[in-house]
């Protein structure tokens, strides 16, 4: 190696396996592993890749920062630099290896330079002990209950405060998907980097921190284009998903009805189809765990034609659901029952309000996107006036277009509403952001013309003076779905609204909703 280095006047490096076999020969200072090597020597659950890199250089200089970055980024067993003298003799050897996560916060250790011929290290024993230490440290930092862990990343032109706020929401989404968040990173950029969203250097830093902290994946708050996702996966074998994929995974968990499952699978396939091209073995990194619940790896690793065929089949099935929905809607219209739909940001308390108003028992856990399938219940007022209360999927900022398209039949229920009740979580950190996000989605769905009332929920968690100020400012009604006495003003206003519609109730009809009665006496 020393002789060849002198002849070509360029550094020469070799990647060696633990058996001492040469895996790759690299000319120059840039260390990039081929896709074949990346595939054969994945880190997976191991702490190290099983490769060490030794390179010559024409000057007696210590390890560069670039070399140390490569060590951490590629999870090499060891990296060594051999100084080649002008007469062809080998001078000092510079070595470095990774360190377990600890109080020092250091990623690697640079050993003291020694003459090459004085090297006495037993590499097999050294690597075995090092990997044992790394595995032990990883076990200490591991997340319990078999949950996956993630580093969250935001890269946008928004202020640091806005990004941090959005990362809080992303963390809530991750928690809803069963992921434990162990770190967050925010990078302000004037424009998203075309290749990696972040610059290549910053992207390496993110991946190094992910590896060092033992995280299973990186979750981006921004949607990654197919080209960006492909470029990132060419750099690493860490699982990488974006916010859209995370939301799709949550929807896959929450879908219970056949219609809901079809809509989620359709959204997932539409999202993944443009990301299938040219991925080869990297596609398998989408398999299993968060970001892939629903269609499954086997289905996605078929050819694009079969995926398109599946999409076509799901679209036909949804069209059938839509026809059935139209028939139900027509029957309901014949009975003349007004429809009031609950809309709002996810986890604002819509299902809880539905349960209290109609004495129902739909799931209303305190987590994002708890409700996915549409639920309709009958609310009966005194004097035998009735309305249908409908609870639908919650909204979120930057709602993925794949979901908007796939859930068209569900969202079409809102078009038939006589009145929308926009539920807002009064205790939310970013109440105005959530309110604006929902209003924007309603406008996108062309629902601006439907009458709607603003309800500020969870007023029991906010000082009464603040409730009064906010309700006056936005023209809202303050309620707490958990405090029935606060619902009296809403109930009175709803009854007056129904009376104004002059709807005559036909109590002999057989509407396909459950029948519950709510009177003033039950609220006293």
Short names for language-model regions:
Residues 1-8, 16, 84-86, 90-151, ...:
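C-terminal-of-GTPase-core extension/linker across diverse P-loop GTPases
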Residues 1-243:
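N-terminal accessory targeting/assembly segments
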Residues 1-103, 290-401, 411-415:
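Conserved G1/Walker A P-loop phosphate-binding module
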Residues 21, 85-89, 156-160, 189-191, ...:
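Conserved nucleotide-binding/hydrolysis micro-motifs of P-loop NTPases
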Residues 67-70, 87, 162-180, 205-212, ...:
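Conserved C-terminal guanine-recognition region of P-loop GTPase G domains, centered on the G4
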Residues 157-162, 191-196, 254-260, 299, ...:
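Flexible beta-alpha connector loops of hexameric P-loop NTPases
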Residues 249-268:
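Conserved phosphate-handling catalytic cores of large alpha/beta enzymes
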């Amino acid at each position: 190696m020393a002789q060849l280095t002198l002849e070509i006047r360029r550094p020469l490096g070799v990647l060696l396996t633990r058996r001492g076999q040469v895996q790759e020969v690299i000319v120059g200072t840039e260390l990039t592993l081929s896709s074949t090597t990346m595939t054969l020597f994945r880190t997976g659950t191991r702490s190290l890749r099983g490769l060490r890199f030794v390179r010559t250089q024409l000057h007696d200089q210590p390890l560069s920062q670039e070399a140390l970055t490569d060590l951490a980024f590629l999870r090499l067993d060891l990296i060594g630099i051999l100084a080649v003298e002008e007469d062809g003799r080998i001078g000092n050897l510079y070595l470095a290896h990774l360190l377990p996560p600890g109080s020092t916060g250091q990623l690697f250790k640079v050993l003291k330079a020694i003459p090459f011929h004085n090297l006495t290290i037993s590499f097999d024993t050294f690597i075995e002990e090092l990997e044992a230490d790394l595995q032990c440290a990883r076990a200490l930092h591991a997340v319990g209950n078999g949950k996956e862990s993630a580093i969250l990343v935001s890269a946008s032109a928004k202020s640091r405060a806005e990004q941090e706020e959005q990362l809080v929401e992303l963390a809530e989404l991750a928690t809803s998907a069963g992921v434990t968040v162990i770190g967050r990173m925010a990078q302000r950029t004037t424009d998203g980097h075309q290749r990696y969203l972040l610059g290549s250097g910053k992207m390496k830093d993110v991946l190094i921190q992910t590896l060092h902290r033992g995280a299973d994946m990186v979750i981006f708050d921004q949607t990654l284009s197919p080209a960006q996702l492909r470029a990132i996966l060419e750099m690493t074998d860490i699982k990488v998903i974006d916010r859209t994929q995370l939301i799709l995974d949550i929807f896959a968990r929450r879908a219970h009805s056949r219609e809901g499952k079809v809509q989620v699978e359709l959204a997932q396939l539409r999202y993944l189809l443009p990301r299938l091209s040219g991925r080869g073995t990297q596609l398998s990194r989408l398999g299993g765990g968060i970001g892939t619940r629903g269609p499954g790896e086997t289905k996605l690793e078929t050819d694009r034609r079969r995926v398109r065929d599946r999409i076509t089949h799901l679209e036909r099935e949804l069209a059938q659901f839509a026809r059935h929905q139209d028939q139900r809607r027509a029957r309901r219209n014949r009975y003349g029952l007004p429809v009031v739909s609950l809309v709002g940001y996810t986890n604002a308390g819509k299902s809880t309000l539905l349960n209290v108003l109609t004495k129902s028992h739909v799931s209303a856990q305190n987590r994002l996107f708890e409700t996915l399938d549409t639920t309709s219940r009958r609310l009966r007022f005194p004097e035998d006036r009735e309305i249908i209360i409908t609870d639908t999927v919650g909204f979120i900022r930057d709602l993925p277009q794949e979901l908007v398209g796939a859930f068209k039949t569900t969202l079409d229920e809102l078009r038939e509403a006589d009145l929308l009740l926009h539920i807002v979580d009064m205790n939310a950190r970013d109440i105005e952001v959530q309110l604006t996000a929902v209003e924007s989605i309603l406008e996108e769905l062309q629902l601006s013309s439907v009458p709607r009332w603003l309800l500020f929920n969870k007023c029991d968690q906010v000082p009464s003076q603040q409730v009064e100020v906010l309700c006056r400012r936005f023209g809202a009604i303050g309620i707490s779905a958990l405090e029935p006495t606060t619902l009296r003003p809403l109930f009175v206003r709803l009854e007056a609204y129904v009376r104004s519609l002059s709807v005559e109730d036909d109590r002999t009809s057989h509407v396909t909703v459950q029948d519950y009665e709510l009177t003033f006496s039950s609220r006293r």
